[in-house]
Amino acid sequence: MVSPSIEVLNSIADGKKYITSKELKKHNNPNDLWISILGKVYNVTEWAKEHPGGDAPLINLAGQDVTDAFIAFHPGTAWKHLDKLFTGYHLKDYQVSDISRDYRKLASEFAKAGMFEKKGHGVIYSLCFVSLLLSACVYGVLYSGSFWIHMLSGAILGLAWMQIAYLGHDAGHYQMMATRGWNKFAGIFIGNCITGISIAWWKWTHNAHHIACNSLDYDPDLQHLPMLAVSSKLFNSITSVFYGRQLTFDPLARFFVSYQHYLYYPIMCVARVNLYLQTILLLISKRKIPDRGLNILGTLIFWTWFPLLVSRLPNWPERVAFVLVSFCVTGIQHIQFTLNHFSGDVYVGPPKGDNWFEKQTRGTIDIACSSWMDWFFGGLQFQLEHHLFPRLPRCHLRSISPICRELCKKYNLPYVSLSFYDANVTTLKTLRTAALQARDLTNPAPQNLAWEAFNTHG
C-alpha cells in the first residue's frame, strides 16, 4: 500500500493529520483504495470486497471525495460503520460547492420528513396486481383452447414481468419489506424465480450505472455493441471498464449500427434474451456474488415453471408466438429504460465525485405523464429524481419533481422532461445521427468487401 508522501500535512493548530486531494488520488486502485466523505479519509480496500453494492462503485470513485454519492445511496445507519475504516487523515483542501450544499440540504430535509421510510401502499397494490395478472395468464393457457386467448395470455405475462421488474427495482434500491431478510427474499423471488433475471446481476450492473451515469466506458447501460451505439465516440473501440474488455467496433458492428434506428424496436422486442444470457454468465462466473446459491436456485425455478407453462400450449407455432408476444410486451419496458438515457449527454472517462449532481442532470431524461400512468412507468418516468435520490420510494418522486426542477433552474442545469412520444422521437434521432456517422467509411474501422457491398446501396 502506498504510504502518505511528503504531501501529508500536519496541523499544529488542531492536532489533526491532513492529506491533499492530490495525495488522495494516488490511492485509486483495487489494491489501494481510499475515499473521502465529508473531508474524512477512509481506507476501503478490503471493505470493497464486502460492500453490499458491489466493488464497482468504490473502484470507479476511488481516490476522490464521494460525499454526495454516499448520501444518495446510504441510509443514516451506514454512517456508524465508517469509523472502523477511518485512516486518521482529513482532506486539507476539502471544499463543498454551492450545488452540493443545496443537494445535501434537500436530502437531509427528506430524511427528517421520514420520506425514505414512508413507502405507502404501492408495494401491496403492485403485488396484488401482479398476482392477478399471473393468475389470468396461467388460466388462459391451461383452460382455453383459443389461439387468441393464448396470445392475450402471453401479453398479460409480459405486462406482469414489467410490473415485477419495477418491484425488483424497488427491492434493489431500498428496503420495501419489513426486514432486510424479507427484502432479500422478495428480490430473489420476484427477480430470479418469476422473471428469470438475477437480482445479483441487476445490482451489479445497476449500481455501476448509477455511479457512472452515461459514461461510455464505465456505464454498462450504454455498452451495447455490436448492435447499438449512442455516440460516435464508441467507434474508437473503447475499453469497457465495467466488463474489462474492448467494445470492438468492427465491420459487423458498423453494419448493425448503420441501421440501428430501424433495428431499435425489433431489438427491444427480444432484448430480454440478452438479460437471460447475462444472468447465466454471471452466475457461472468466478466473480464473487452475494447469495450465489439462492440466485442459482431462483433462476432454476424460473426455467422450470416457464417452459412447463409454454409446453401446455397445443403446438409449436403457438408456443413460439406466445413467447414472442410476452417478450414484445415487456420490450416496452426496455424502450422506457433507454429513453431515459440514450439521448442524454455522454462522456468518456471515470465518474467524478465532485460533480455528482451535474452528471445526473445531464445524463437523464424524464418522461412527462399524468399521475394515473405512474403504475405503467413504475416511477422511473422521474428518472432524474430517482438518480438524485435512489433510495426514495417511488410514491414520493412526483412530489419532489418541482423541487428538483427549481434546483436545476437555480444552477442553470438541464431538466429535460419529454412526452413518451417525443422521447421516442429524440431517441431515434440520436440513433440515426450515430448511424449516419457509422456509414462514413472515412471513420477508422476494419473494413471488408462485404461491408462495402452493403453500403453501396445506402
From Swiss-Prot:
The family database entries (InterPro entries) matched by this protein are listed as:
Cyt_B5-like_heme/steroid-bd, Cyt_B5-like_heme/steroid_sf, FA_desaturase_dom, Fatty_acid_desaturase
Membrane-related topology note: Multi-pass membrane protein
Q: What EC number(s) does this enzyme carry?
A: 1.14.19.29
List this protein's GO terms for biological process. Answer: sphingolipid metabolic process
Motif residue range(s): Histidine box-2: 206-210
Q: What does the entry list under GO cellular component? A: membrane
Keywords per UniProt: Electron transport, Heme, Iron, Lipid metabolism, Membrane, Metal-binding, Oxidoreductase, Sphingolipid metabolism, Transmembrane, Transmembrane helix, Transport
Q: Please indicate the residue ranges that the annotation assigns to the motif Histidine box-1.
A: 169-173
According to UniProt, the reaction catalysed is: an N-acyl-(4R)-4-hydroxysphinganine + 2 Fe(II)-[cytochrome b5] + O2 + 2 H(+) = a (4R,8E)-4-hydroxysphingenine ceramide + 2 Fe(III)-[cytochrome b5] + 2 H2O; an N-acyl-(4R)-4-hydroxysphinganine + 2 Fe(II)-[cytochrome b5] + O2 + 2 H(+) = a (4R,8Z)-4-hydroxysphing-8-enine ceramide + 2 Fe(III)-[cytochrome b5] + 2 H2O
The listed location of motif Histidine box-3 is 383-387
Which Pfam family, just one, is annotated for this protein? Cyt-b5
Every copy of the Cytochrome b5 heme-binding domain together lies at: 16-100
Give an example GO molecular function: sphingolipid 8-(E/Z)-desaturase activity
Its localization reads: Membrane
Instruction: Give the residue spans that cross the bilayer.
Output: 122-142, 147-167, 185-205, 264-284, 293-313, 320-340
**Secretion signal, residue range per the UniProt entry:** none
Give the cofactors, semicolon-separated: Fe cation
Listed binding positions for heme are: 51, 74
Tell me which family the UniProt entry assigns to this protein. Belongs to the fatty acid desaturase type 1 family.
Instruction: Please quote what the entry notes about the protein's domains.
Output: The histidine box domains may contain the active site and/or be involved in metal ion binding.
- What does the UniProt function comment say about this protein? Plays a major role as delta(8)-fatty-acid desaturase which introduces a double bond at the 8-position in the long-chain base (LCB) of ceramides with or without a hydroxy group at the 4-position. The enzyme produces both the 8E and 8Z isomers. This structural modification contributes to the quantitative partitioning of ceramides between the two major sphingolipid classes, glucosylceramides and glycosylinositolphosphoryl ceramides. Sphingolipids are important membrane components involved in environmental stress responses, such as resistance to chilling, and act as cell signaling molecules.
Query: Per its record, how is this protein called by name?
Result: Delta(8)-fatty-acid desaturase
Tell me what organism the protein belongs to: Helianthus annuus
